[in-house]
Structures are given as structure tokens and as C-alpha cells.
């Protein structure tokens, strides 16, 4: 689940990251191959590839797997993927954005629609919910990078627009076209970030109750387990008391 949300914490505590690790590697490798195919195979000369490689390293993807994904882009047998965004509403009207990378658009569209229908949602048209989100760059640092004031000052100097800090880390937001520039400026002051990526940031988040959270988790699990789905983002947050019950 993309974005700074309690969802990520629940996902971690429930061990979902381990369960999805092989799928995560596969999806990241696909992004690396596509990024390298669309631009230069050298990450230093290809901003999208640089971010993809950084994301792969953040989840400890082996170096040889990363190199193999880049090499695959230069071969004549590299698949052609279409990048399609789907938008809709989940249970209780929660807005959901699903980003996919597929070699069969009909298959993916059918699958995504079926997940929404099965788990109490409704797939809409492109633009039906994205107006409730901002497309921004998100740079993540661990708490050890500094206190909130230190990170805030560094972010302002680097040209960032917003910072969210708590005991689990710092999330720095910037314009989608300035992600690489801001990320590089921050590295000079705070060191290398944990992650830097483009995200759909909700303009407002809705706190959900236990029943809604359970329904949302089923929908998001189904989407994230689909090989064609790269990211899933929603405009909701799960309060700590609800999260504790989900973990029980």
C-alpha cells in the first residue's frame, strides 16, 4: 500500500511483507526492466530507473537480480508492457487508485473489476477519484536521520513542499517533477534516504472502523496479490485502536 498510512504498519506487523516478498521482487524487476527499456540502462542517466533500483535495494533485492532485470531490457525478447491506472471506490466509499503494468490489458481490466465487485467496491472511470489525490514525490528517512526540526529545515532547503514526522520516521514530499533533484539535495545533508518514489498522496484521509478496515484489507490483499498490479493507494487511515483489533 503506497503512502504514509497506518496500513503499512499493519502490513508489517501481520507479516504480509514476507508473504509478498517474492511477488514484490517480481514487480520491482518488471519496473526496472521497463524503466531501462524506455530510457538509458545506466541508472545515473535515467531518473526512473534510478528510483526503481533504489526501491529494489530498499527491500534487499539481490544485486544480481537487479542487474538481470536491466540486462533483460536490452534483449529483443523483452515483453511490451502497458501502464494502466484504474480508479474506483472500495467499501464505505473509500477512494482507491490501482496502478498496473501488464502485457494483457483485457486480462488485467477483468481481474481488477472482479476484485472491486467481489469485495464491496465499485470500479470507476479514469479520473473518477484521482482528483482527491496529489501526484507527488515521497522521500522516506528513518528516525535516526535527525529530529523533526532538523529534517524540516533540510527539506525546505532542498525544495520540498511538506514533511510528516513521527516516531517511525520522516516522510518528505515534493513536486512529482522535482523528486530526483530534491532527493539528491537531501542526500548531501541527511545521507541516503530509505526510499524515494512517486505516490498518489490523499488530500484528505478518512479514519475507518474495524468492519470497514477488514473489508478494505480483503480488497487490497486481492489487488496486491495480482501480478499485474504495481501499487494500490487509498484515502483512508486505520486508527491505532482499530489496528490493534485487526492484529488480534
From Swiss-Prot:
Major location category of this protein: cytoplasm
A GO BP annotation: regulation of DNA-templated transcription
Source domain of life: Bacteria
Region (Disordered): 1-21
A GO cellular component annotation in the UniProt record: cytosol
Protein name: Probable transcriptional regulatory protein Rsph17029_2308
Family that this chain belongs to: Belongs to the TACO1 family.
Keywords: Cytoplasm, DNA-binding, Transcription, Transcription regulation
Entry keyword Transcription regulation: yes
Alphabetized InterPro entries for the sequence: Integrase-like_N, TACO1_YebC-like_2nd/3rd_dom, TACO1_YebC_N, Transcrip_reg_TACO1-like, Transcrip_reg_TACO1-like_dom3, YebC-like
GO molecular function: DNA binding
Pfam hit, one: TACO1_YebC_N
Highest classification ranks of the organism: Bacteria, Pseudomonadati, Pseudomonadota, Alphaproteobacteria, Rhodobacterales
Subcellular location: Cytoplasm
Stored NCBIfam families: PRK00110.1, PRK12378.1, YebC/PmpR family DNA-binding transcriptional regulator
Amino acid at each position: 500500500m503506497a503512502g504514509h498510512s497506518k496500513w503499512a504498519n499493519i502490513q508489517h506487523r501481520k507479516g504480509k511483507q514476507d508473504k509478498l516478498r517474492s511477488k514484490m521482487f517480481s514487480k520491482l524487476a518488471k519496473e526496472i526492466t521497463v524503466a531501462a527499456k524506455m530510457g538509458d540502462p545506466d541508472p545515473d542517466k535515467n531518473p526512473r530507473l534510478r528510483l526503481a533500483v533504489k526501491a529494489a535495494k530498499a527491500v534487499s533485492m539481490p544485486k544480481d537480480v537487479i542487474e538481470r532485470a536491466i540486462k533483460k531490457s536490452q534483449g529483443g525478447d523483452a515483453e511490451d508492457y502497458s501502464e494502466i491506472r484504474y480508479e474506483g471506490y472500495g467499501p464505505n466509499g473509500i477512494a482507491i487508485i490501482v496502478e498496473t503494468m501488464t502485457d494483457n490489458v483485457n486480462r488485467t481490466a477483468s481481474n481488477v473489476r472482479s476484485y472491486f465487485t467481489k469485495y464491496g467496491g465499485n470500479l470507476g472511470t479514469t479520473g473518477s477519484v484521482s482528483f482527491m489525490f496529489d501526484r507527488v514525490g515521497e522521500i522516506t528517512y528513518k528516525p535516526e536521520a535527525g529530529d523533526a526540526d532538523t529534517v524540516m529545515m533540510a527539506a525546505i532547503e532542498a525544495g520540498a513542499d511538506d514533511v510528516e514526522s513521527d516516531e517511525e520516521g520522516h516522510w518528505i514530499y515534493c513536486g512529482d517533477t522535482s523528486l530526483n533533484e530534491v532527493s539528491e539535495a537531501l542526500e548531501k545533508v541527511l545521507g541516503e534516504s530509505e526510499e524515494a518514489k512517486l505516490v498518489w498522496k490523499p488530500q484528505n484521509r478518512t479514519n475507518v472502523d474495524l468492519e470497514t478496515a477488514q473489508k478494505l484489507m480483503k480488497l487490497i490483499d486481492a489487488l496486491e496479490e495480482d501480478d499485474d498490479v504495481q501499487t494500490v493507494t487509498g484515502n483512508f487511515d486505520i486508527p491505532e485502536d482499530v489496528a490493534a483489533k485487526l492484529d488480534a
